[in-house]
Amino acid sequence: MKNVTDSFVSLGYWPSAGSFGFNTDILATNLINLSVVLGVLIFFGKGVLSDLLDNRKQRILSTIRNSEELREGAIEQLEKARARLRKVEMEADEFRVNGYSEIEREKQNLINATYENLERLENYKNETIHFEEQRAINQVRQRVFQQALQGALGTLNSCSNSELHLRTISANIGVLGAMKEITD
């Protein structure tokens, strides 16, 4: 490495009269030296620079392609999600409408069942009242019949004598005899 550096340093000490050499003093360089240095840099650096630029260009294009593919995929997923959302919204509306109609139907069924139950209860109440009335009437009749029977028995016992018994028996025998003649 030292030899390479020494060779460049020795180039700087060559006499500039009549020979070609590099002037390493940047402030003392002239336009020709600068153009030679630039020419050498362009000639040798052109390939490296174009390779770097091509690599950079390929990476940028690859990144753009990947971004476009990702964008298209995202757009496709967005459209699918929108389609699913529309479908779910339609199903929700359908459920909502069906739910409201189902609620109305159940409400009407409940009202009808309630009216039927009330009607049955009213009929049962009326039947119970009628039954209780009949039972009360029958009890009153039995009581009246018992009192009348007791009164009649009391009257018969108080007024009974053998003559009355004989007349009652003969009247009953006469009634039975008349009935026998009618049936024959």
From Swiss-Prot:
Transmembrane residue ranges: 27-49
Keywords on record: ATP synthesis, CF(0), Chloroplast, Hydrogen ion transport, Ion transport, Membrane, Plastid, Thylakoid, Transmembrane, Transmembrane helix, Transport
One GO cellular component term: chloroplast thylakoid membrane
GO MF annotation list: proton-transporting ATP synthase activity, rotational mechanism
Subcellular locations according to the entry: Plastid, Chloroplast thylakoid membrane
Membrane topology reported for the UniProt record: Single-pass membrane protein
CDD domains (UniProt xref): ATP-synt_Fo_b
HAMAP family to which the protein is assigned, alphabetical: ATP_synth_b_bprime
Further details from the record: In plastids the F-type ATPase is also known as CF(1)CF(0).
Function in brief: F(1)F(0) ATP synthase produces ATP from ADP in the presence of a proton or sodium gradient. F-type ATPases consist of two structural domains, F(1) containing the extramembraneous catalytic core and F(0) containing the membrane proton channel, linked together by a central stalk and a peripheral stalk. During catalysis, ATP synthesis in the catalytic domain of F(1) is coupled via a rotary mechanism of the central stalk subunits to proton translocation. Component of the F(0) channel, it forms part of the peripheral stalk, linking F(1) to F(0).
Annotated PANTHER family: ATP SYNTHASE SUBUNIT B, CHLOROPLASTIC
Family: Belongs to the ATPase B chain family.
Quaternary structure, from the entry: F-type ATPases have 2 components, F(1) - the catalytic core - and F(0) - the membrane proton channel. F(1) has five subunits: alpha(3), beta(3), gamma(1), delta(1), epsilon(1). F(0) has four main subunits: a(1), b(1), b'(1) and c(10-14). The alpha and beta chains form an alternating ring which encloses part of the gamma chain. F(1) is attached to F(0) by a central stalk formed by the gamma and epsilon chains, while a peripheral stalk is formed by the delta, b and b' chains.
Official protein name in the record: ATP synthase subunit b, chloroplastic
Organism field: Liriodendron tulipifera (Tuliptree)
